[in-house]
């Protein structure tokens, strides 16, 4: 399975339009090579470099396996989980200092998950255990210019 974006290269700098310094839009994501036996997809974006521990920016699960693209500034079909701000939906990079890494992690599962909207990443990851068929990752970096 592959996860790419026309907005930035893997390990490359994310443009400011996808951050708190710009329009705070989610980037366009392209999904390919989904296993044919997958029943749902999960997308998690997090920042392991946050001073308070890993910060969850975007959590979505039960995304249909027919999803090949998530358009810029949109939420994929599926169930929205809760990010570290306590909200659902995308929250862009806004690092307090230095360069941070932002991991977009895509998982193909062998089932749909019976979890409610607003589920935390921790609870989602617990429910995903033993259900992951494939995974892909895209990493972007960002540093605020102050």
Features from the language model and the residues they span:
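N-terminus-centered regions that define maturation/targeting leaders and the start
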Residues: 1-146
